[in-house]
A protein has these predicted regions:
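Transmembrane helical bundles and short interhelical boundary loops of multi-pass, membrane-embedded
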Residues: 303-356
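Transmembrane-helix motifs of polytopic, lipid-linked glycan transferases
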Residues: 18-42
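Short acidic/glycine- and proline-prone juxtamembrane loop motifs at membrane-interface regions
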Residues: 61, 67-74, 111-113
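Short hydrophobic alpha-helices at membrane interfaces in multi-pass membrane enzymes
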Residues: 91-106, 307-310
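Specific aromatic-rich, kink-prone transmembrane helix
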Residues: 30, 75-92, 104-105, 124, ...
Length: 356
């Protein structure tokens, strides 16, 4: 996208950065449309969409990457687009919409390699559990999506491998003869998760590592600033969804939505927590769409959950700021006070205007 923009408008900052901002805006818009499809109530749906879109747009990792020349903006747009296609596929058990899911994820793979496929388990599970058709039909539908994914994500790899090495343009690491498969499966693939090789030394001084473990993403200051301060609120949202499901208060598409976003969030959180290769804190941008969607869904379905999520997010932000010793101590107390005030105002508003 950036290359096309530069060809059209010349090499300048606007040509490089405007496409990233446009893709960020598009990702927010597609997430809003997805939430409208999940929450079909004419009042709750737009509110859930606005909350989800606002969380995505205001998450620091997203705010950074949507104005930076990096593939993450396009990756997030394609992942959210795949979620929209899945939400369209489930109600009618449509293999055509599911094929579009595969195409979008294949393009996400080309954009950021294996990171673009972290949502694959969430999508497959949601369709398997909630598509209103027989198990015998669900398997062929998923197979069609898998074929579409392989074709859309593998055509460029195949072209590079089949192109004569002597005239092959640069692909990765700046060398014309670099094997594309090694890049996708090694340096930019499994090595990022399990370590190995010498990935950290390949011109990425910004790479950041710490001890792998589930607590890394919660207690790491770097990841905390970017997105993980939303995780306590997202956990409250997941618990809310489970309670609503057990009480049979969710429609089929709402249950599918909670499942999709929850598995998306859990898988990405575990991957980022246990990665032993090179890790950049901005990778947590992949958490933002799922966290925003879960928070939006829970907020419109449970008043108490909305209040608890506000307090949980603010409390964890204060903890992270205190651990990182960022800013004066008065800032921490100001955030805590603002969160308490917001929670009280929300509780009063919900009491006075029950339709909220």
């Amino acid at each position: 996208m950036t290359g096309l923009s530069v060809r059209l408008f010349g090499m300048n900052s606007w040509a490089v950065l405007v496409p990233q901002a446009v893709m960020g805006v598009a990702a927010v818009a597609v997430l809003y449309a997805t939430m409208r499809r999940i929450i079909t109530d004419p009042t709750r749906g737009p509110i859930a969409g606005l909350i989800a879109g606002s969380v995505l747009a205001l998450t620091p990792a997203a705010t950074l990457m949507f104005r930076y020349n990096n593939p993450d903006a396009l990756m997030v747009l394609l992942m959210v687009a795949a979620a929209y296609f899945l939400v369209r596929a489930i109600p009618g058990a449509s293999w055509r919409w599911l094929t579009l899911v595969g195409i979008a994820l294949g393009l996400a793979f080309l954009t950021k390699m294996l990171e673009g496929l972290m949502v694959l388990p969430a999508f497959a599970l949601a369709y398997l559990l909630f598509a209103p058709t027989t198990w015998q039909r669900r398997a062929p539908h998923l197979l069609s999506a898998a074929v579409a994914l392989v074709i859309s994500g593998g055509w460029w790899v195949a072209v590079v491998q089949l192109w004569p090495a002597g005239s092959r343009p640069p692909t990765s690491a700046g060398r014309p003869t670099t094997r594309c498969l090694i890049s996708h499966g090694g340096y930019n693939g499994l090595n990022r998760i399990v370590g190995g090789g010498n990935a950290v030394s390949h011109g990425h001084p910004g790479g950041w590592t710490t001890h792998a473990g589930v607590l890394r993403i919660f207690f790491s200051a770097e990841m905390g600033y970017e997105a993980s301060w939303l995780l306590p609120a997202a956990v409250v949202a997941i618990v809310t969804g489970v309670c609503l499901a057990l009480r049979r208060r969710l429609t089929r598409i709402e249950a599918a939505g909670f499942t999709m976003w929850s598995v998306w969030l859990v898988v990405c959180t575990l991957v980022f927590s246990y990665m032993t290769g090179m890790v950049h804190p901005y990778y947590t941008i992949a958490l933002a769409p799922a966290a925003g969607a879960l928070i939006g869904m829970a907020a419109v379905r449970s008043r108490s959950a909305a209040i608890v999520m506000v307090l949980a997010a603010a409390a964890w932000a204060v903890v992270l700021l205190h651990r990182a010793r960022l800013g004066p101590a008065s800032t921490h107390w100001f955030i805590a006070g603002a969160a308490i005030a917001a929670g009280l105002l929300l509780a009063i508003a919900l009491t006075r205007w029950p339709r909220l």
